[in-house]
């Protein structure tokens, strides 16, 4: 069976995307991947209203590095962001999407991470859970979902200009 997304696109200085879909899958990760020309070693993202530079090993594969001893958490190529992440001159501004991943020459933004248990004791990336397992069935985000983001070609030093295009400043 084939599934499709409807993607609305508009172009100004940024290309704006709005993706609407009906999520019927539990415990699933939805991402949009941006394939860049080179392996992604460095990203710049907005965190706490400033730009953070992060270094990555683009060839790191968590599945090949799962911890064998208790109390160890596997390194990951996922990172948080507020509204912006960029690499190699590509900038992505999101509305409420706060996680991205680096792997090889791709920069992926998480559209939806549907989960049913927080601190799942069966998570292979953690040999010891972060806390007691908590069931959160609504975190599966079943049903209609909308993800919005904008993409442009700009340097990290210009990110505020482009963030303002998506989130105009309000003067009181």
Feature map (PLM): residue ranges:
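C-terminal (or distal) subdomains of carbohydrate-active enzymes
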Residues: 1-172
